[in-house]
């Protein structure tokens, strides 16, 4: 049940995915649904099945008034830190909309530096349908990228854990060392680099 219900003609929702992983970009999406989108089943992207997310990914793009998927790269994450890189990705997503939003809801408790009228909403992906839609676009995009990267960098299990620090991933880092898609500013990756330099 979505609680934030202001007039929705040009209200955007923004969310990002990929703060916690040790590898890959952080991906953000911004979505303006409009008042009569008729999309059923919107919910926090982490709480619905992959099959349902994939179906909604297509429906959201077909029916949204406007959407944009953006990112901050591994290099930007290492240079700026993950929080500022996440905010940068969200800012890029909003700037990529082909319609200027009248108001923006951002998932979380921090807003990017911008001049838009906006509000940060904690657990917004379950309270604001535009944020939920953005969450789905960002998660499906990033998950698919990690599956593709798993083929390019085999042995790390990226398709399964999507870059998160699971036991499989941590063991692979120790065994194989990090790749160029690993975030060197994250402690487990730094530790793996230091370990490789010992030999």
Curated annotation (Swiss-Prot):
Catalytic activity: Endonucleolytic cleavage to 5'-phosphomonoester
Occurrences of domain RNase H type-2 (ranges): 9-198
Keywords: Cytoplasm, Endonuclease, Hydrolase, Manganese, Metal-binding, Nuclease
An example molecular function term from Gene Ontology annotations: manganese ion binding
InterPro entries cross-referenced by the UniProt entry: RNase_HII, RNase_HII/HIII, RNase_HII/HIII_dom, RNaseH-like_sf, RNaseH_sf
Protein name: Ribonuclease HII
Functional note: Endonuclease that specifically degrades the RNA of RNA-DNA hybrids.
One annotated GO biological process: mismatch repair
């Amino acid at each position: 049940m979505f609680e934030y219900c202001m007039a929705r003609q040009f209200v955007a929702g923004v969310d990002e995915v990929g703060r916690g992983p040790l590898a890959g970009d952080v991906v953000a999406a911004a979505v303006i649904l409009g008042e009569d989108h008729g999309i059923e089943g919107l919910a926090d992207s982490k709480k619905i099945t992959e099959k349902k997310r994939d179906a909604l990914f297509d429906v959201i793009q077909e029916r949204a008034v406007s959407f944009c998927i953006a990112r901050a790269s591994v290099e930007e994450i290492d240079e700026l830190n993950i929080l500022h890189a996440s905010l940068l990705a969200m800012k890029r997503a909003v700037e990529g909309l082909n319609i200027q939003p009248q108001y923006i809801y951002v998932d979380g408790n921090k807003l990017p530096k911008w001049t838009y009228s906006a509000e940060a909403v904690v657990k917004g992906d379950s309270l604001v349908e535009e944020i939920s839609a953005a969450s789905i676009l960002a998660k499906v995009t990033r998950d698919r990228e990690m599956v593709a990267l798993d083929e390019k960098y085999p042995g790390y299990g990226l398709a399964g854990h999507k870059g998160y620090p699971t036991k499989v991933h941590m063991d692979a880092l120790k065994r194989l060392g990090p790749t160029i898609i690993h975030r060197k500013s994250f402690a487990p990756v730094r530790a793996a680099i230091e370990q490789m330099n010992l030999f």
